[in-house]
Amino acid sequence: MKKSPSVLVIGGGSTGTGIARDLAMRGLDVTLVEKGNLTHGTTGRMHGLLHSGGRYAVSDQPSAKECIEENRVLRRIAGHCVEMTGGLFVQRPEDSDEYFEKKLEGCRECGIPAEVLSAEEAREIEPYLAKDIKRAIKVPDGAVDPFRLCVANAASAVEHGARIETHSEVTDVLVEGGEVVGVEVTHQTGTGPYVHGEPGEVEEIRADYVVNATGAWAGQIGDFAGVNVEVRPSKGVMTIMNTRQVDTVVNRCRPKGDADIIVPHETTCILGTTDEEVEDPEDYPEEGWEVDLMIETLSELVPMLADARTIRSFWGVRPLYEPPGTGTEDPTDITREFFLLDHADRDDLPGMTSIVGGKLTTYRMMAEQISDHVCEKLGVDAECRTADEPLPGSEDFTVLRDYMDDFGLRSPIGRRSAQRLGSRADEVLNSVDPNPVVCECEAVTRAEIQDALDTAGTDLNSVRIQTRASMGNCQGAICCHRMANELAPEYDEKTVRASLDDLYQERWKGERHAMWGTQLSQTALKHMLHAATMNRDEDPAAADADIDFAAFDDGVASGGAVADGGRERAADRADDDALGGADGDN
């Protein structure tokens, strides 16, 4: 039997997992390596917009046309990852009438359904819009869960025979005889079925073809291979509010600018964004003024944002690219199109292609085109099926809205579980009995946590990505330790505590940019719960000295404290004090 050609995909974001799925469905032998969790890079740090294309209808019509086409595809194949909120491009009195008309005309030229609404009609859809807005354009924007989408693509790839290796960092590209023949990876700390090496272990993975799908990090992979990939990373801030101040994507209808979009996402709203070029996608300043800008500017569209509660902020890095010699200075002017860089044609280095640019909405189209390219290189004749075959969990998830009573769940919890799990809800929610809620903010049940642990091992941040547990208002104050409890008794205490610490630190990275008002009070409560009540600042398990538990008081006999509130014991102590102290009391 003839061996299938092998392809190595570098990068576990939406594009990388989409490529792995596409190639695996065509029958190729696929391995994907990712240095962290899936969605470690740009995919896990975006505002969750499913583009209609309206944002690019004036400035970048090729990208706009790609967006509306893929918007329709994703609604069909990934319904459990998408919420069709609709979108509004809102004009304020100071915004240009000419630009408004250009936006409307551009949408229609690109095949994007667009309807003009009066201010009153727009406020019927979103009552909290500013009272002085002029009008709006309605478009089919939506919200997409990038974590769920990425995991679903990876799961489909595995179902079709692909191998996924997380926590495996590429540290070199293997070049022999003037051709790329594979990569060297160094395995990092991690657990679960997708971790295939010991921490620090170095492994060579050889392949017939290598795809560099690392986005903003593509230049670093290019350096390993001795070629120049001119990615221009551009950072943007996103600020998360505690509730959904709007249920529709709200855009400012004006030319390019910072702080011009509000995306309702799950139980929150995400405000975005800035666009500032950086040299290193791993190391750049996260500045408070950027967060302030989001709130101050977008309050002009939705005034209640000025006094709303901010729960965290985070930054992501766009993998922008333009052909050499273009010379664009402002990153907002760089196209959002994607590019395939065939290093055989471009750099006389066969065996590797890089894919750069683009956006999450068009990930599947990007994956299809590079998969066509790889198949042509390898002489494989196989059609793409990813636009027609639903992702795991997406086949018939609407019927799951009736599961609440069956599983003894409060209906909001059942509804949220069905939305997250899609057609897998029956299987997962029946797997644990009893099935209490672990994360109240996001309505995540124990069954969902256990299901996520099947692939996450001890990585609680991976559980967070899959379920949204710890991503609500309290940012894990109430549920983080509950999540860690689910690791016992399979894992020892040291391992569980280390996993819990990693989850806390990941939560803290974004919380520290939102410490004012009500959220500061929430953070103080979280600190008191964990640092004081749970003694996490002075962890006795980490102390060198052994604890003499025999020296502790035995306490009240069972039921005593409930029966008399401890009054009898207090009276005994008072009598002892009056007598100068009894044995053992000093």
From Swiss-Prot:
Swiss-Prot/TrEMBL cofactor(s): FAD; FMN
UniProt entry keywords in alphabetical sequence: Cell membrane, FAD, Flavoprotein, Membrane, Oxidoreductase
CDD domains the UniProt entry points to: GlpA-like_Fer2_BFD-like
Function field: Conversion of glycerol 3-phosphate to dihydroxyacetone phosphate. Required for growth on glycerol and for glycerol metabolism.
Topological type in the membrane: Peripheral membrane protein
PANTHER family, A to Z: GLYCEROL-3-PHOSPHATE DEHYDROGENASE (PTHR11985), GLYCEROL-3-PHOSPHATE DEHYDROGENASE, MITOCHONDRIAL (PTHR11985:SF15)
Protein's recorded name: Anaerobic glycerol-3-phosphate dehydrogenase subunit A1
One Pfam family matching this protein: DAO
Location within or outside the cell: Cell membrane
Null mutant phenotype: Unable to grow on glycerol. Can be complemented in trans by glpA2 under the control from a strong promoter.
Organism this protein belongs to: Haloferax volcanii (strain ATCC 29605 / DSM 3757 / JCM 8879 / NBRC 14742 / NCIMB 2012 / VKM B-1768 / DS2)
